[in-house]
């Protein structure tokens, strides 16, 4: 059964991403576009527009040809938007790297995308230069002063402010080559056209519109799909002002909300967790906040409710993949209350099926199955990897997400877990996210993750890694979960740790914990 959005279809304009995002820039002049929270430095819309034109002109003068790749390896800074849209305006394609990537990780992405240019900042220059050398990147730029092997970014902006005249087909030409998370091996390059990224923004705006008076704070990284699409492009399209953070620190985050009177938080579950449970929250004036939006990973009903009750504000979710150009569903910002634990409702122009993973047959309405989606925001495939593309994108245009979901009778979507992350306990499928939601509701638990431990008798047993808020015994937590789930879904062991490994986007890096479990089993065997 094909499920369609409850919202009427929207028109997707036939324009490039910069044309769409920057359509109203000339009318905004001295209005702040991006505020660097760490320094207080402000980039106005006039400065943004001029910087983008200069960047495009500079890249053309340096030899960037349409379709060639410009890489950005930096945290959330105003120059990110200048470089991103400057490269696209010049006809280039952008790939974004985590500034915390190792030399090998960065070199892999640079080589895989055939990047010709790379922009970074001084603290990451050594890694960037080593990676660029391994990958054959021709030119490296750095913010601030030039350094050995790297030109100053300001030099790139010194070739006038007339962008090159390039022809871009929004439906065919790529805007971004973004890497999948890489939590299970080397990442894959996700090919996204201008039209796909424009479609995602138009669709999301139907459910969650932004106005020019908004002042969201965005701790999630711009190099991540959610950060650049919502924290940067959606905000700039609306003519709003975004307050950025180079990294998340709870005290700095709260202070910035108070200082800049932020109206919204664009975050991920760890940020919602801090707002719901951290004692520092009570020391700051957060009365300007109107909403909190969480993405990048599932947010439990308990945590969503706890945050909403503490702040007295709307707390919603959005769901999507890099492969879906950002968005599949979102909590509507239309006055109705968010449904706790739900990732919202399908955005317009999007179709979905919920299927039995092994057969592809549709499951009965309201039951759990793998989510397949189809819409104009989807990727065209994985770069240079037709085999991997064929595994997830079928001939009828359905993207097989690998996520287990259910969609209720009212059209609200609930993410149950990743198909590949299910723990197989004596033939039963155990969803780690369900157990994490239960454990996260315990007052002594600050953070947690659940993975499978190889077991000769059971196949795998669920093991909880827990960061304690206060003293608590593992047996108490095991009993707490056992009282709330069926026997196959009980946690069988608890490991206390100082922190849960997460990606910069807030996703639990289960591979690290799973590797630890496999290593422990080998040592004990």
Describe the predicted segments one by one:
Residues 42-46, 175-199:
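Conserved AMP-binding A3 loop
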């Amino acid at each position: 059964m094909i499920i369609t959005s409850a919202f009427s279809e929207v028109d997707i304009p036939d324009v490039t991403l910069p044309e769409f995002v920057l359509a109203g820039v000339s009318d905004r002049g001295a209005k702040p576009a991006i505020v660097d929270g760490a320094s207080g430095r402000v980039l106005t819309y006039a400065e943004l527009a001029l910087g983008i034109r200069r960047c495009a002109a500079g890249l053309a003068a340096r030899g960037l040809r349409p379709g060639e790749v410009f890489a950005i390896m930096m945290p959330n800074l105003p120059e990110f938007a200048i470089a991103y849209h400057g490269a696209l305006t010049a006809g280039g394609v952008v790939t974004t790297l985590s500034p915390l990537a190792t030399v090998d990780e960065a070199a892999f992405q640079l080589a895989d995308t055939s990047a010709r240019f790379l922009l970074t900042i001084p603290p990451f220059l050594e890694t960037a230069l080593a990676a660029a050398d391994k990958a054959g990147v021709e030119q490296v730029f750095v913010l601030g002063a030039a350094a050995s092997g790297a030109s100053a970014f300001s030099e790139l902006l010194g070739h006038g402010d007339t962008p090159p005249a390039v022809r871009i087909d929004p439906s065919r030409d790529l805007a971004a080559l973004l890497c999948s998370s890489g939590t299970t091996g080397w990442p894959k390059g996700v090919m996204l056209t201008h039209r796909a990224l424009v479609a995602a923004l138009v669709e999301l705006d139907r459910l969650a519109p932004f106005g020019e008076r908004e002042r969201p704070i965005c701790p999630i990284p711009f190099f991540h799909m959610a950060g650049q699409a919502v924290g940067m492009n959606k905000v700039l399209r609306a003519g709003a002002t975004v307050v950025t953070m180079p990294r998340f620190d709870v005290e700095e985050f709260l202070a910035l909300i108070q200082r800049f009177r932020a109206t919204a938080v664009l975050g991920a579950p760890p940020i919602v967790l801090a707002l719901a449970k951290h004692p520092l929250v009570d020391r700051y004036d957060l009365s300007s906040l109107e909403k909190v939006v969480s993405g990048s990973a599932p947010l439990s009903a308990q945590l969503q409710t706890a945050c909403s009750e503490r702040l007295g504000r709307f707390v919603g979710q959005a769901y999507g993949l890099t492969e879906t150009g950002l968005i599949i569903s979102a909590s509507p910002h239309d006055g109705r209350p968010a449904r706790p634990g739900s990732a919202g409702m399908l955005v317009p122009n999007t179709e979905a099926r919920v299927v039995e993973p092994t057969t592809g047959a549709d499951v009965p309405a309201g039951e759990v199955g793998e989510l397949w989606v189809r819409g104009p925001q989807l990727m065209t495939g994985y770069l240079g990897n037709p085999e991997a593309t064929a595994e997830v994108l079928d001939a009828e245009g359905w993207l097989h997400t690998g996520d287990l979901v259910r969609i209720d009778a009212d059209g609200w979507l609930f993410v149950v877990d990743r198909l590949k992350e299910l723990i197989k306990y004596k033939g039963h499928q155990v969803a780690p996210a369900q157990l994490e939601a239960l454990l996260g509701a315990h007052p002594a638990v600050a953070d947690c993750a659940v993975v499978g431990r190889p077991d000769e008798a059971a196949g795998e047993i669920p093991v909880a890694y827990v960061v304690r808020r206060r003293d608590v015994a593992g047996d108490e937590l095991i009993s707490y979960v056992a009282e709330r789930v069926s026997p196959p879904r009980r946690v069988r062991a608890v490991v206390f740790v100082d922190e849960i490994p997460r990606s910069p986007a807030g996703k639990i890096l289960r591979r690290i914990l799973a590797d630890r479990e496999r290593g422990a089993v080998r040592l004990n065997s």
